[in-house]
Amino acid sequence: MGDCTRGLVRLSEERKVKLLKRVLGGFFNKGSEYLFQCPKCDHHKRKLSINLDKEAFKCWVCDWSGRNIYRIIRQFGTTDDKYEWKSFNQQIEIEKFADKLFGPKENERQAEISLPNAFISLANKNLPTTSIYPLNYLKSRRIGKKDIIKWKIGYCPKGKYGGRVIIPSFDDKGEINFFVTRSYDRNWKKYMNPEVSKDIIFNHPYIDFDEDLVLVEGVFDAIKAGDNSVPLLGSTLTEHSKLFGEIIKNDTPIYLALDPDAIKKTNKLISLFLKYDVETHLIEVSPFNDVGEMKKTEFLERKKSALFLSSDNYLVNRISKM
């Protein structure tokens, strides 16, 4: 490495340390290791170790760790701090790598889809008398007007999807890419969805991958989970899924809140996320059958107390349940 290159590396490191100090406060320096107070557990001693050479961090008290220092900036820094850190090469390279590994496949086209002809938006002011039935159903699930407007919920009084609430999804271009239907009468088939690929990001335009993302089973769970929640629609998330690609590309922190009876699926997702060093938290859903049964306030409280997962504590937890 030439003198010029070494000088640039030192300058880059100095800029990073200066930014970290602005976000975290004072520090001790031990070679390439910098010790700060941990903003996660707020321990009074400087136990958060940050290694700029390895682009890694770990708190020796609460076990918070990761292989992307930008996580710290994203969670505790300002908008300007985030922008400045992203100007450093590491974050750019991560995004390029993710684009290459998880980017769109050639000739990949999403099947065209549109809402049913009989669809009526429940967000309208003047509604027909038939709207009383889907509105009563939504009310029974504690879903009010704000949710109806936000999720653009409607219904079909007749036709193929007659007697069903309709919740549409939009892709990143604002086009409909899926919709979920749920019967509000006594139809034996509760859900009847279009026969198109579920490899989508439900309501992509409303998801901020730079913030915590909640993964739930169904769309009614997502409504209760609030902002930045994505339903998996009963599908299994894989390394080739569009949603997974965006999570890796943006190094998005994940909060898992799947149904309690989906233990195998939850464990599979946890293993997958930990394999890619995704910051993962587990939300306790029991004794409820799903998030959709909770009040929004209940879910938020549970999210606050979610279990942070690392390879170590996840393995110990699994062994203890054997």
Q: What does each of the following model-derived ranges do?
A:
Residues 41-44, 62:
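Short Cys/His-rich metal-coordination motifs, predominantly Zn2+-binding knuckles/fingers
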Residues 38, 59, 138, 167, ...:
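Terminal peptide-recognition signature
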Residues 1-42, 76-166, 170-173, 208, ...:
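TOPRIM metal-binding catalytic domain and adjacent DNA-binding surface shared by DnaG-type primases
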Residues 244, 265-277:
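Short, aromatic/basic amphipathic alpha-helical patches
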Residues 16, 157-252, 268:
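Phosphate-handling DNA/RNA-contact segment within nucleic-acid enzymes
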Residues 215, 251-265, 283-284:
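Acidic beta-strand-to-loop metal/phosphate-binding motif
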Residues 48-83:
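Short Cys/His-based metal-binding microdomains
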Residues 165, 245-251, 290-304:
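Short, surface-exposed amphipathic charged segments that create phosphate/polyanion-binding patches used
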